[in-house]
Amino acid sequence: MFDDLPPLSHQEQQRAVEEIQKLMAEGMSTAQAIKIIAEKIRAEHKAQSAE
């Protein structure tokens, strides 16, 4: 599931954790929150790679 995630800096990892925690605080399951943030990271990385 996470094999295609790009390497993240500590700051990027921290930001991802904070976003996941925010989604969970809004009532989302942990798995769903992780899935959403992972997809967001993949999309951002793909967009940067295309430039």
UniProtKB/Swiss-Prot annotation:
What InterPro entries does the annotation carry?
A: UPF0181
Q: Which Pfam families does the record cross-reference, listed alphabetically?
A: UPF0181
**Superkingdom per UniProt:** Bacteria
- Which family is annotated? Belongs to the UPF0181 family.
Q: Which NCBIfam families match?
A: PRK05114.1 (NF003476)
Stated name of the protein = UPF0181 protein VVA0806
UniProt source species:
Vibrio vulnificus (strain YJ016)
Q: Mind giving the lineage of the organism this protein is from?
A: Bacteria, Pseudomonadati, Pseudomonadota, Gammaproteobacteria, Vibrionales
